[in-house]
Amino acid sequence: MKVRKSLRSLKNKPGAQVVRRHGKVFVINKKDPRFKARQG
C-alpha cells in the first residue's frame, strides 16, 4: 500500500473505491491492487 498526498488520480481508475476508516481515506482497487493507497 502506498501513502499518497492526493488520491484524485487513483480514484478515477476503473474498479476503485474510496473508503474512510478511522478518519483516514483509503482507495481500494480489487481489479488492480497496485492502486491501493492511503491519504496522508
Swiss-Prot record:
Listed InterPro entries: Ribosomal_bL36, Ribosomal_bL36_sp, Ribosomal_L36_bact
UniProt keyword terms in alphabetical order: Ribonucleoprotein, Ribosomal protein
GO CC entries: ribonucleoprotein complex; ribosome
UniProt GO MF annotations: structural constituent of ribosome
A biological process term (GO) from this entry: translation
Family: Belongs to the bacterial ribosomal protein bL36 family.
Name under which the protein is recorded: Large ribosomal subunit protein bL36
Gene name tied to this protein: rpmJ
